[in-house]
């Protein structure tokens, strides 16, 4: 690439703390862009509850179209108690499902890292959790959440778990490709001792692995995997699983760092990637400059990975770690005897340290 690389970002601040945490993510993107020779242009669009209030739709057509025309989508958070009684397509969260469908994404990436500086914040023993670095690769469009038939019957209810060979194969390829960039180990999680769908899952994943002999593969039943995530999380590198099991396991692992404010996510595989923090809109602290922007900033790092700016993505992660190592803590992480860093102050620290982690005119890798 030349020195005129540029990326158009569809910025969806959303509700609650979404605007303030993604604002810091954009600050960091601009800082590392200057250091790595690319520019970022972010254009704001409405989504979620704020879009409902203004347009009557949680995902206006104009927002959807802008996302499809962008290089990446950065989302803050959607929803809140104001819209808690809404149903169907009048729920703010329905806009997120519609956006994922429009973008065609099928792979959800959920990194869970416990930086050494924050090991004491974990509910687990620091010597067991410190240094944890797991990437959950969750299939996002199939499984029991979308299988048919489903619904209430005269005497009960039914849900259907279903996967096709192709759906399993494509998500397995994502997991093996990501493992090659990391430590080269994939743990595939299923329930093949009970479920026929899981038997197929294990068979197809094993077949895909035949084409990736440089990556190590092991299989775990989901109940054992849940125990192992708590017992020894550092054993995992990439965890590959279906929609239901991935939903549960990634939320279980989300407790390891000690704050949802540290957890980013990406939904990829379609025309454009969607990047968002795992946490919700937290309306009770919105607008107070106290929210932790780390998850949004690390989501921006995933965005950079996806568009090929891997050195800049690593610089962002280094900036977060450096700020934490220097003792900067937002309110959710600060000890009683520590001074809190505001949302904006923490974002500035990360931006400065991320930009300074490489020479100003570093060559493109």
UniProtKB/Swiss-Prot annotation:
<feature type="binding site">
    <location>
        <position position="251"/>
    </location>
    <ligand>
        <name>Mg(2+)</name>
    </ligand>
</feature>
<feature type="site" description="Important for catalysis">
    <location>
        <position position="191"/>
    </location>
</feature>
<dbReference type="InterPro" id="IPR004429">
    <property type="entry name" value="Isopropylmalate_DH"/>
</dbReference>
<feature type="binding site">
    <location>
        <position position="223"/>
    </location>
    <ligand>
        <name>Mg(2+)</name>
    </ligand>
</feature>
<dbReference type="InterPro" id="IPR019818">
    <property type="entry name" value="IsoCit/isopropylmalate_DH_CS"/>
</dbReference>
<keyword id="KW-0963">Cytoplasm</keyword>
<comment type="subunit">
    <text>Homodimer.</text>
</comment>
<feature type="binding site">
    <location>
        <begin position="80"/>
        <end position="93"/>
    </location>
    <ligand>
        <name>NAD(+)</name>
    </ligand>
</feature>
<keyword id="KW-0464">Manganese</keyword>
<dbReference type="Pfam" id="PF00180">
    <property type="entry name" value="Iso_dh"/>
</dbReference>
<comment type="function">
    <text>Catalyzes the oxidation of 3-carboxy-2-hydroxy-4-methylpentanoate (3-isopropylmalate) to 3-carboxy-4-methyl-2-oxopentanoate. The product decarboxylates to 4-methyl-2 oxopentanoate.</text>
</comment>
<comment type="similarity">
    <text>Belongs to the isocitrate and isopropylmalate dehydrogenases family. LeuB type 1 subfamily.</text>
</comment>
<protein>
    <recommendedName>
        <fullName>3-isopropylmalate dehydrogenase</fullName>
        <ecNumber>1.1.1.85</ecNumber>
    </recommendedName>
</protein>
<dbReference type="InterPro" id="IPR024084">
    <property type="entry name" value="IsoPropMal-DH-like_dom"/>
</dbReference>
<comment type="pathway">
    <text>Amino-acid biosynthesis; L-leucine biosynthesis; L-leucine from 3-methyl-2-oxobutanoate: step 3/4.</text>
</comment>
<keyword id="KW-0479">Metal-binding</keyword>
<dbReference type="GO" id="GO:0009098">
    <property type="term" value="P:L-leucine biosynthetic process"/>
</dbReference>
<keyword id="KW-0520">NAD</keyword>
<keyword id="KW-0460">Magnesium</keyword>
<dbReference type="GO" id="GO:0003862">
    <property type="term" value="F:3-isopropylmalate dehydrogenase activity"/>
</dbReference>
<keyword id="KW-0100">Branched-chain amino acid biosynthesis</keyword>
<feature type="binding site">
    <location>
        <position position="100"/>
    </location>
    <ligand>
        <name>substrate</name>
    </ligand>
</feature>
<dbReference type="GO" id="GO:0051287">
    <property type="term" value="F:NAD binding"/>
</dbReference>
<keyword id="KW-0028">Amino-acid biosynthesis</keyword>
<feature type="binding site">
    <location>
        <position position="247"/>
    </location>
    <ligand>
        <name>Mg(2+)</name>
    </ligand>
</feature>
<feature type="region of interest" description="Disordered">
    <location>
        <begin position="337"/>
        <end position="365"/>
    </location>
</feature>
<feature type="binding site">
    <location>
        <begin position="280"/>
        <end position="292"/>
    </location>
    <ligand>
        <name>NAD(+)</name>
    </ligand>
</feature>
<feature type="binding site">
    <location>
        <position position="138"/>
    </location>
    <ligand>
        <name>substrate</name>
    </ligand>
</feature>
<dbReference type="GO" id="GO:0005829">
    <property type="term" value="C:cytosol"/>
</dbReference>
<feature type="binding site">
    <location>
        <position position="223"/>
    </location>
    <ligand>
        <name>substrate</name>
    </ligand>
</feature>
<keyword id="KW-0560">Oxidoreductase</keyword>
<feature type="site" description="Important for catalysis">
    <location>
        <position position="145"/>
    </location>
</feature>
<feature type="binding site">
    <location>
        <position position="110"/>
    </location>
    <ligand>
        <name>substrate</name>
    </ligand>
</feature>
<keyword id="KW-0432">Leucine biosynthesis</keyword>
<dbReference type="GO" id="GO:0000287">
    <property type="term" value="F:magnesium ion binding"/>
</dbReference>
């Amino acid at each position: 690439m030349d020195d005129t690389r540029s990326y158009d970002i569809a910025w969806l601040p959303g509700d609650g703390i979404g605007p303030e945490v993604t604002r810091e993510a954009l600050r960091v993107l601009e800082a590392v862009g200057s250091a790595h020779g690319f520019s970022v242009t972010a254009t704001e669009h409405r989504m979620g509850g704020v879009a409902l209030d203004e347009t009557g739709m949680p995902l206006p057509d104009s927002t959807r179209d802008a996302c499809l025309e962008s290089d990446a989508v950065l989302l803050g958070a959607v929803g809140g108690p104001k819209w808690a009684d809404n149903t169907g397509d009048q729920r703010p969260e329905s806009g997120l499902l519609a956006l994922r469908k429009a973008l065609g994404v099928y792979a959800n990436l959920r990194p869970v890292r416990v930086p050494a500086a924050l090991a004491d914040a974990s509910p687990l023993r620091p010597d067991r959790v410190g240094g944890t670095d797991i990437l959950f690769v969750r299939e996002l469009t199939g499984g029991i959440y979308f299988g048919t038939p489903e619904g209430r019957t005269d005497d009960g209810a039914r849900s259907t778990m279903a996967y096709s060979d192709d759906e399993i194969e494509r998500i397995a390829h994502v997991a093996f490709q990501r493992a090659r960039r990391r430590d080269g180990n994939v743990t595939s999680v299923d329930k093949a001792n009970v479920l026929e769908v899981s038997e197929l899952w294990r068979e197809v994943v094993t077949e895909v692995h035949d084409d990736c002999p440089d990556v190590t593969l092991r299989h775990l039943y989901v109940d054992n995997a849940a125990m192992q995530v708590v017992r020894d999380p550092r054993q995992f590198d990439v965890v590959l699983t279906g929609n239901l099991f991935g939903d549960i396991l990634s939320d279980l692992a989300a407790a390891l760092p000690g704050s949802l404010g540290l957890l980013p996510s990406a939904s990829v595989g379609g025309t454009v990637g969607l990047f968002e923090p795992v946490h919700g809109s937290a309306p009770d602290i919105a607008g107070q400059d106290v929210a932790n922007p780390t998850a949004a900033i690390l989501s921006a790092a995933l965005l950079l990975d996806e568009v090929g700016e891997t050195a800049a993505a690593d610089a962002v992660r280094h900036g977060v770690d450096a700020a934490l190592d220097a003792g900067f803590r937002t309110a959710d992480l600060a000890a009683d005897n520590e001074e809190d860093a505001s949302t904006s102050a923490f974002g500035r620290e990360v931006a400065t340290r991320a930009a300074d982690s490489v020479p100003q005119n570093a060559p493109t890798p």
